[in-house]
Amino acid sequence: MASLKDVQNQIVSIKKTKQITKAMNMVASAKLRGAQDRIERFRPYADKFYEMLGDLAAGADSSVHPLLEVHEEIKTVGIVLTTSDRGLCGSFNANMINAALKKAAEKKAEGKTVKFYCVGKKGAAAVAKTEYEIVEAYKDDMTHFDFNLAASIGNKVIDAYLAEELDEVFLVFGEFVNVASQPPNTLQILPMSSEAAGEEAESGASSEYIYEPSVEGLLAELLPRFVKVQVYRGLLDTSCSEHAARMAAMDNASRACDDMTETLTLLYNKTRQAAITADLMDIVGGAEALKG
Amino acid sequence: MASKLLLEIVTPDRKVLSQEVDYVGAPGIEGEFGIMANHIPFLSALGVGNLYFKEGNRTHYIFVSGGFAEVGNNKVTILAEVAEKAVEIDIARAQKAQEKAKARLAKAQDRIESARAQAALQRALARLTCKDAAQKAGTTTH
């Protein structure tokens, strides 16, 4: 049986752990708010962007652009995996990585080569242990990224796609549904389906615009940017989800700490009582012996 | 007839500006264009450069890069990857960027590298002219 001192030490250490998990929970919730703000700020841009693209797609006969074109033979598949840089966020990163690896295994079974673009340390570390090639790993960027990160990832995959080094590109990100649910989501970003581009085409009762340069010229400018917008949205979602997942994980940890302290305190009291009883028995026994 | 138009500038990170103005001049990809109230619907890609707008007798300057302009219904919407008001431009940083870009341009090996350096140089120059123009117009405090 554990000694009194042992139990006491254990209680103290668990209480300290709880302080940490509680602090992390609060930090995560503050960061989550920040990340949600960013999504909110991004929304006007994204909405306007889709609207513009919709107007254009409606005006143009699904004009052929290299990014819309499906390559004849699909040999190489690129996967952009977004994860967090830090752990302690429950199964969030594991979920992202599993989703990406599942997609990769699927593609590999079809005889295609899979290449990874990893954002976030966790994903890069996990993929490095597999047989797949990592073309580019962005580490320590998830904590403070801006549109430039999305733009540079976008440019990388677009260049590779145009050079026919990649024939399909998928984005794996943690979709932020709400604080309790952040399922991994896989989105095909290249080749772009013209439906995705013209998604809002019907709703946009497009007025007669003057286009400068031409519709095709504008599409050529807009489409690459659309890839970046999608990547940026994925990054924002992942970062939001990361913080939400960490919040939940830390909340659970704090609660587990409470449970453990309770059990241990009970044990402590029992042990203490037992010790006192034993002491009393000794004293009484001694007194009886003296009388005798 | 309305004589003012609403100018809105949004970037992925924030809404830079939303206000009523009299005139907007923007660096279109095929040359600068001006927009006044009651312009017909118009959609254009923007190059790297300075956008300016007049409000009363004051002219304000904004640096934009990688964007689009949509005009319609007395509203101008600018979607830009980067947009900085003159007051937000960091001169020292722009100057440093300019020197760096020049150095890179001088020793650029291939076409891509030199194109990148050139683009960087163009951005730095545009930032500097933007600040300059705003200082001349006396609107750096806005």
Curated annotation (Swiss-Prot), chain B:
Stretches of the chain forming a coiled coil according to its record: none
Keywords per UniProt: ATP synthesis, Cell inner membrane, Cell membrane, CF(1), Hydrogen ion transport, Ion transport, Membrane, Transport
Record membrane topology: Peripheral membrane protein
Cell compartments where the protein resides: Cell inner membrane
GO cellular component, one term: plasma membrane
GO molecular function: ATP binding; proton-transporting ATP synthase activity, rotational mechanism
Highest taxon of source: Bacteria
Database matches in InterPro entries: ATP_F1_dsu/esu_C_sf, ATP_synth_F1_dsu/esu, ATP_synth_F1_dsu/esu_N, ATP_synth_F1_esu_C, ATPsynth_dsu/esu_N
Cysteine disulfide links: none
Functional summary from the UniProt entry: Produces ATP from ADP in the presence of a proton gradient across the membrane.
Subunit details: F-type ATPases have 2 components, CF(1) - the catalytic core - and CF(0) - the membrane proton channel. CF(1) has five subunits: alpha(3), beta(3), gamma(1), delta(1), epsilon(1). CF(0) has three main subunits: a, b and c.
Protein family (similarity comment): Belongs to the ATPase epsilon chain family.
Name of the protein: ATP synthase epsilon chain
Species of provenance: Maridesulfovibrio salexigens (strain ATCC 14822 / DSM 2638 / NCIMB 8403 / VKM B-1763) (Desulfovibrio salexigens)
Gene name per UniProt: atpC
